[in-house]
Every structure is written in C-alpha cells, then in structure tokens.
C-alpha cells in the first residue's frame, strides 16, 4: 500500500513523532496509517493517540429535548458557508425536532418521517440541495431517555440555539428537583464536550479498542526487557489506565481536577436529598471520523480555466 507526503504530514500531526520516524513507520506498515500510529506508540515515539478524530466535514449538530427524552442529529454539508445559511439551520433544527417527536431510530427512518412544511424529511433535504446548490446529508442520530428525571442539552460553540459543532446530551435518572438536575447536567455536559469520553463505564468500552491498547502496551513492555511477570503487570496497568481515562464515570472532572464524575454525581445527589444516576450521554462532534478531501485551490482554478 503506497503512501504520500500528505500521509507523513498527517501522521506527524496525529502523533507528534518526527518526520523520519513517521516515514519509517509507514514503510514498515506498508502504508497502513493506523498500523503506523500503533507502531510509533509501541516504540514510545508517539503520545497516546489523540481522542479527537479528524473533523474536517462541515455542517451542524442539532440537539432537542423534551423532559425525559432527548436526541442528537448530525447533518453534513460541503462548506461552512452553507452551515451558516438560515435555510440550512432551519432544516437542521426542524429535522432534529422531528427525530425527537417521532423517535426515529435511524437516519432512514428520519428521512421517511413527515416534515413540518409538508412532504418528508428526505423531500426537504432534496429541495435544500437543489436550492442551496450544495450536497447535504443526514449522517447520524442518537436518542437518550430516562423513566424519571431529566435530559440536559448542551451545545459547545453554538451557531444558534441548540445548533453547533459539538452537541451533548446528559440523561440523569432521579427524583431530585429539576433545577438541581439541570445544573448538574450542564456541568457534566461541559465536561463531556471537553474530555471526549468513549463510553459511560469501563465495561462499556469497545472490546476492539481495549485489545488494541493491550497489544500496544505488550509491545512496549517487551522492549523493557523485564521479566514476564513484570511485563504482564505493566500491560494490565496500562490498560486499566486507558479504561479509567476514557470511561466517563471514572474520568477526573475538568472543573475541579480531582473528583471523578461518579463522585460529582454522588455528591450532587447527597446535596439534593435524592439518589442521582448518570444513565447515559451523547457527544456528537461535527465530522467526527470523517476526513474531508483536501484540494489544491490553484489547481482547481487552472483546471476550470483550461490551463495545464
């Protein structure tokens, strides 16, 4: 698998490793980018993989809540210019409300749902593409709900009410007063936006991610030259640290830098006089996991003008 200079540049940005180390890692991995990342980490030449995925895609994330339920929706566009368009923003807002009210389980179900202005959500999307002149697509949707309690929304760097680039929902199960839950939910949502947890608890973490971290830790331990039993403890310790840092309830609260999120929730429940359970959460970051194709603007202009 061949690789390009852009791959080397991206690998340097992703890992912080030197250029020659990045080239060597890509050579050894046959151009496999993720394998090169793992190889650099195993050799101690890269910091832990950044949790933020490449987020070059444009568009908006929308959130909507109604008491004990909430939904997050991501709608992509080709440029940030369209994301600032009133027509596009109105569509994302209304489509998110439709998703909430119809409990659409996925993007296809949402497309088939009735749109407030007539027709279906898919019809309105098609009309938007035609009138705005840029491709747009519904990318993903997720619901959260509690039987008794509240779902709290938060939008980081909001472009408009409940629209922006990072949308968060926090589902709190409790009989505590709504204002207490609202305040707690807002704080936790801000933490989630900043800390990027990968799961609610360590047990909820993707098994493939854990296996990947264990493999990297084992390679690092093997290079230490220490006895097998010591290496095993090193690996277990590294995996446990990874799980603790990436599971929401065990993360250290960014606002006090000492309490875990679970401790923050427990303390809030004690103060409110009712047990509070952080049941679920959603964190949608615009374009997460999507890499936008980079183009050479000068080359595009030359091509359009017929210049070789």
From Swiss-Prot:
PROSITE patterns: EF_TS_1, EF_TS_2. GO terms for molecular function: translation elongation factor activity. GO terms for cellular component: cytoplasm. It is found in: Cytoplasm. Keywords: Cytoplasm, Elongation factor, Protein biosynthesis. It holds the Pfam family EF_TS. The keyword Protein biosynthesis applies. InterPro entries: EF-Ts_dimer_sf, Transl_elong_EFTs/EF1B, Transl_elong_EFTs/EF1B_dimer, Transl_elong_Ts_CS, UBA-like_sf. Residues 79-82 are annotated as: Involved in Mg(2+) ion dislocation from EF-Tu. PANTHER family: ELONGATION FACTOR TS, ELONGATION FACTOR TS, MITOCHONDRIAL. Belongs to the EF-Ts family. NCBIfam families: tsf. Associates with the EF-Tu.GDP complex and induces the exchange of GDP to GTP. It remains bound to the aminoacyl-tRNA.EF-Tu.GTP complex up to the GTP hydrolysis stage on the ribosome. This is Elongation factor Ts. The lineage of its organism: Bacteria, Pseudomonadati, Pseudomonadota, Alphaproteobacteria, Sphingomonadales.
């Amino acid at each position: 698998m061949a690789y390009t200079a852009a791959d080397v540049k991206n690998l340097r940005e992703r890992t912080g490793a030197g250029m020659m180390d990045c080239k060597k890692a890509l050579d050894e991995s046959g151009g496999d980018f993720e394998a090169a990342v793992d190889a650099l980490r195993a050799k101690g030449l890269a910091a832990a993989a950044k949790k933020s995925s490449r987020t070059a895609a444009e568009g908006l994330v929308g959130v909507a809540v109604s008491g004990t339920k909430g939904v997050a929706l991501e709608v992509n566009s080709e440029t940030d210019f369209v994301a600032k368009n009133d027509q596009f923003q109105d569509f994302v807002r209304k489509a998110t409300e439709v998703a909430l009210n119809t409990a659409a389980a996925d993007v296809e179900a949402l497309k088939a749902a009735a749109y407030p202005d007539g027709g279906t959500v898919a019809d309105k999307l098609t009309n938007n593409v035609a009138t705005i002149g840029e491709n747009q697509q519904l990318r993903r949707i997720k619901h959260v709900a509690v039987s008794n309690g509240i779902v709290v929304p938060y939008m980081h760097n909001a472009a408009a009410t409940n629209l922006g680039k990072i949308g968060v929902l926090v589902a709190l199960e409790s009989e505590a007063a709504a204002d207490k839950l609202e305040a707690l939910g807002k704080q936790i949502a801000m933490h989630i936006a900043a800390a990027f947890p990968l799961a609610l608890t360590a047990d909820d973490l993707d098994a493939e991610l854990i296996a990947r971290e264990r493999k990297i830790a084992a390679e690092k331990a093997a290079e230490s030259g220490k006895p097998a039993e010591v290496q095993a403890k090193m690996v277990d310790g590294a995996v446990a640290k990874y799980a603790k840092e990436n599971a929401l309830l065990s993360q250290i609260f960014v606002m006090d830098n000492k309490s875990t999120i679970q401790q923050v929730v427990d303390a809030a429940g004690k103060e409110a006089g009712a047990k509070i359970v952080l049941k679920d959460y959603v964190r949608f970051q615009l374009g997460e996991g999507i890499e936008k194709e980079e183009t050479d603007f000068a080359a595009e202009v030359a091509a359009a003008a017929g210049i070789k």
